[in-house]
């Protein structure tokens, strides 16, 4: 049994595909660093991530797959599911070995099916994030939303919010992965008045320089609660609490008790999202 270990990045996985074909090996078990080796396995081959090798593999995929097929690979990878590594590796290897243009649509292949289903789960959560994100307004005019999705969907929802809220600064922060995106009204240095923004940030994650990918060096010092997304009282806009109370009142007022269906509500709006939703997290 041939075992490859890699750094659990997409470039690392593509490099593993390159190494597999370069060494002309057929059956390879791919494991992320730290995963337990199978019993009686030989000394594993450690994959050293190489952006050049990864780029060559990706260009090869562009020749073999449609845009939907490439999209399926990148979106499924955002799931961050360790169980995807082997099926995705197998799928990419089959693309080059079989050279079948319709392989990406072959649902009878277990590897293709797993990648497709994973892609669907990520896209489903992407839709839910667009629906369930709730913003609060800080005194400096910045809008904050804290989320904690199962999958790493922030990179594929930012354009949606940039289109809809391009006239106001906002920060969407993933508490689970400890990073977020800040949208500024103008490109260039971050405004010093943005009290929600950390001192350091990296630009270039969105369509233009108005979007910054940010992390906080000390999350304990941020002016909001990561457990429920609430802004600290001294930072919250003077009238935002009023709007929150009005929204909760409206939410209760439109509820028809005789038609309440908790099971349906949980199916449409899973409980794991409630802690960050104004209408569900109480006062």
Q: What spans do the regions from the language model cover?
A:
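Ala/Thr-enriched low-complexity intrinsically disordered regions
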Residues: 186, 194-195
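Short, charged/polar micro-motifs that form catalytic or ligand-binding hotspots
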Residues: 3-11, 43, 47, 105-108, ...
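Glycine-biased, low-complexity coil/linker segments
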Residues: 194, 200-205
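Charged, alpha-helical interface segments at or near domain boundaries
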Residues: 31-127
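N-terminal ordered "arm"
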Residues: 1-52
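Short, hydrophobic/amphipathic alpha-helical patches that form generic packing surfaces
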Residues: 12-23, 90-94, 159-163, 245-252
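Internal, well-folded beta-alpha domain core
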Residues: 101-185, 210-221
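Long, compositionally biased intrinsically disordered terminal regions
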Residues: 167-169, 181, 212-283
């Amino acid at each position: 049994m041939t075992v490859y270990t890699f750094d659990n990045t997409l470039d690392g996985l593509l490099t593993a595909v390159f190494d597999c074909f370069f060494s002309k090996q057929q059956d390879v078990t791919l494991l992320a660093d730290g995963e337990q080796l199978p019993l009686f396995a030989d000394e594993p081959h450690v994959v050293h991530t190489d952006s050049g090798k990864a780029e060559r593999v990706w260009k090869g995929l562009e020749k073999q797959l449609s845009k939907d097929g490439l999209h399926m690979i990148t979106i499924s990878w955002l799931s961050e599911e360790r169980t995807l590594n082997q099926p995705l590796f197998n799928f990419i290897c089959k693309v080059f070995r079989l050279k079948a243009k319709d392989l990406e649509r072959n649902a009878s292949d277990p590897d293709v099916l797993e990648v497709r289903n994973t892609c669907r789960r990520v896209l489903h959560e992407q839709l839910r994030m667009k629906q369930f994100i709730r913003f609060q307004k800080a005194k400096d005019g910045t809008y904050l939303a804290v989320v904690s999705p199962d999958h790493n969907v922030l990179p594929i929802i930012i354009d949606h919010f940039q289109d809809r809220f391009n006239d106001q600064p906002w920060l969407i922060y993933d508490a689970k992965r400890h990073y977020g995106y800040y949208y500024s009204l103008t490109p260039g240095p971050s405004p010093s008045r943005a009290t929600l923004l950390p001192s350091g940030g990296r630009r270039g994650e969105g369509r233009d320089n108005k979007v910054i990918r940010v992390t906080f060096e000390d999350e304990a010092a941020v002016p909001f609660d990561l457990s429920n997304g609430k802004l600290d009282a001294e930072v919250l806009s003077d009238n935002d609490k009023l709007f929150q109370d009005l929204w909760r009142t409206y939410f209760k007022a439109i509820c028809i008790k005789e038609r309440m269906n908790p099971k349906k509500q949980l199916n449409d709006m899973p409980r794991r999202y409630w802690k960050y939703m104004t209408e569900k997290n109480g006062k």
